Amino acid sequence: MMSGARSPTAPHANNPTPQAVPPPEQSDSFLGVTGNAGEKHVFVMVGLPARGKTHMARKLVRYLSFFHGADARVFNVGYYRRQRVGRDAPPDFFDPGNAANVATRQACAEEAMKEMKTFLFHDRAQQAIIDQDADQDRLKGPKGVYSGLVGVFDATNSTRERRAWISQELAGLPVKVIFVESICTLEDVIEQNIRDAKTVSPDYQHVQNTEEAILSFRRRLDFYKQAYETLSEEESHLSWVKLINCGQKLVINRIHGFLPGRIVQFLANMHATQRSFYFTRHGQSQYNVRGKIGGDSALTEAGKAYARKLAEFADMHICRGDDGEPQKARLWSSSMVRTRETAQFIAHPKLALEGEGVWTQMSHRIYRNLDELYAGVCDGMTYEEIEEAFPDEFARRKRDKLRYRYPRGESYLDIIARLDPLVMEMESYHEPLLIIGHQAVLRLIYAYYAGYPREEAPQLSIPLNTIIKLTPKTYSCEEERICLLEINQEDGQREPPSH
């Protein structure tokens, strides 16, 4: 009989340290669970160039796809412009006083809008709704039958006229429209975004001369400033959110509902400041040596050796910047014995920061939401024992590891639900973060940031004794793997079968 948070399998000879039952997942974390199955959403980006709009758009789609199971897509007007006029459009192409170029850019926006509508309403009944000749009664018809569809209309959309056109295009359709404006007055952030455009923007990647590309971008920006109109009370009938200076201030207007509220929370935590995440599994545990899954066993001597190596690495590389000087850094782990023991040698010196007070370096934050996937009645068993005792369960898991749930245990989808709030917090951090975790949990966090579909996460490699460094960027994610201790196939450190 289960008591409190203890495992339903009581301690016994084969499983002396069972894993505790993990915290309950948030059942409302997935689209379609609590929301209207026919709801669709459009998020319209607003703002000057170099304000992080495309970064926000891509991150938003990634978040909704991975954590909420939504079919979400970015419709970038710049892509359609490059298809029409090429990627060498001169700065004066964006001159608001040039009627011909204004018309061309509007045509690009119309093409993006048309494709977004097709994506959102791709069944025949909905296609009739978006037909230009459909009568107004049909515009008030029932919502579509497809759940979790999100379109992100990514462009400057920086005039009231353009936003009125977007509103008119979507008026009467069964879709919620929310405008998202990014405002930044921080010159250092703007300058960094301009310089990043040389390496990440498809408009400038081919330009060999960096200063020439930056000058061209600045001239383009000047043209946009001439016509820029921020969201204001004149558009109070619209639903919108303003993010000012990387989330320092948030202004919300007519935002209602579960998903819009969730998105506002996500956007409020997001910023474009570059930082790195470091992921590592715990050191070798006693159950690793015995080939058992789950449990809550302690480290072996080899595991403690890795913990010492990790502490040295953290001090030299995570807690110091490129110049070798101390920098603020964070540390998370699960609540399980093996991760807490892996963190035990990491130092926590105090940093006196001008204007910020005292910072405790690598202050250890422990989260049960980072605990390993719970194997239920199979906790503490080897895979051979599971296959022998529960052959049908073993076969089901092999067919679909993402959705398979152990009897009285968890699935990868359950872990996704409990990781959602932690990723929200990770997005808000400006400092490097080290997470000491477990294979299944780190597979999911890694997959999210590295850009893998969640269906592929259960097969990704997260080896022992290895640090994975990820540095997310607008169009990519840089990855580096550092092996701190060689894995000896003969001493119990062999990679166990996949959890």
Residue ranges and their predicted role:
Residues 54-121, 133-137, 141, 146, ...:
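Conserved substrate/cofactor phosphate-moiety recognition/catalytic segment
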Residues 4, 12, 29-33, 169-172, ...:
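NTP-dependent small-molecule kinase module
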Residues 33-39, 143-146, 426-428:
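Phosphate-binding P-loop
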Residues 49:
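The conserved Walker
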Residues 1-42, 66-70, 271-272:
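Extreme N-terminal, non-catalytic leader segments
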Residues 45, 153, 435:
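Hydrophobic anchor at the beta1->P-loop junction of P-loop NTPases
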Residues 155, 163-164, 169, 176-200, ...:
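Phosphate-coordination/substrate-recognition cap region in phosphate-metabolizing enzymes
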Residues 91-101, 132-136, 170-230:
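A glycine- and Lys/Arg-enriched "phosphate-lid" helix/loop adjacent to the NTP-binding pocket
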